[in-house]
Design a protein with these regions (language model features):
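A feature for loop-to-transmembrane-helix boundaries and adjacent hydrophobic helices
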Residues: 1-271
Length: 271
């Protein structure tokens, strides 16, 4: 699979970058659309999305570089070449989350409400962004056979793309992309439930993505390691536990209080 979309000599455009940008655009558009329901000004949400993306990319790259330091210790310039791959999504989630918490606290906005609004855009962005790994021939699973891939009824271009230097590999990028897509669809319906409470959509995201990533990570051959443990699996366990705690805490009390869709009590948020 050719990772380069366009090579004009003076500029090279990688498929990885295109898929990441496409995921950011679609995810960001959904966040902006949902924020309008809550009377959140475009200036506020644009600034929030911009800062979260910046810090999210920094965090995702930082986690990858830290656990792959031997690869960059003698090639510091390579650290900034994110278009070649090497973004650890968990690092991006953590730094992006911290950015949102600080930003919302600064402007005295309900942090939980903002997190609930953004997770739908985040998970569909992840579903799309994973295809960047496909074009980079990375984030794949163990070696397999052509017959196995054909039994999955995959499109021909995916099967051909999983033939890397003469060996077929399991498309774990696709497993995660589909998992995120299913989570996206569930979230769309879940947060429209009458009794859905503030904080529950983000709790569902933590649980759903954590479970999927934990098992999919076990198949990957390029996991970042901390001793004998896969970093992504450790963080996924943390996400699942955190999500369960949030879900339980937010479920307490009257079903009619602190509802996500209680727009009547929403005050306009301006930057």
């Amino acid at each position: 699979m050719n990772p380069i979309l366009i090579d004009l000599g003076f500029i090279t455009i990688h498929w990885y970058s295109i898929m990441i940008l496409l995921g950011l655009f679609i995810g960001g558009s959904l966040i902006i659309r949902e924020s309008k329901r809550f009377k959140i000004s475009e200036d506020y949400i644009f600034n929030l999305i911009f800062l979260t993306i910046i810090f999210g990319i920094i965090g995702a790259r930082l986690e990858y570089v830290i656990f792959e330091w031997d690869q960059y210790s003698n090639n510091l310039l390579g650290i900034i070449k994110i278009w070649e791959g090497g973004l650890a999504i968990h690092g991006g989630i953590i730094t992006g989350l911290l950015c949102m918490i600080i930003y919302t606290k600064k402007y005295k906005v309900n942090t939980w409400n903002i997190l609930d609004i953004t997770v739908v855009g985040l998970i569909i962005g992840q579903a799309i962004g994973r295809w960047g790994n496909f074009f980079n021939s990375e984030a794949h699973g163990p070696a397999t056979t052509l017959e196995f891939l054909q039994q999955l009824h995959l499109p021909k271009f995916i099967i051909e793309g999983m033939n890397i230097y003469g060996t077929y590999y399991q498309p774990t990028f696709l497993y995660e992309s589909i998992w995120c897509l299913i989570g996206f669809i569930i979230l769309l319906f879940f947060r429209r439930r009458y009794y859905c409470k503030i904080g529950q959509p983000v709790a569902f995201y933590f649980i759903w993505y954590g479970i999927g990533r934990f098992f999919i990570e076990g198949l990957r051959t390029d996991s970042l390691m901390l001793g004998d443990f896969r970093v992504a699996q450790l963080i996924s366990i943390g996400l699942i536990i955190t999500g369960i705690i949030i879900m339980v805490v937010k479920s307490r009390g009257s079903k009619l209080k602190n509802r996500y869709n209680d727009l009547e009590n929403t005050n306009e948020i301006r930057f």
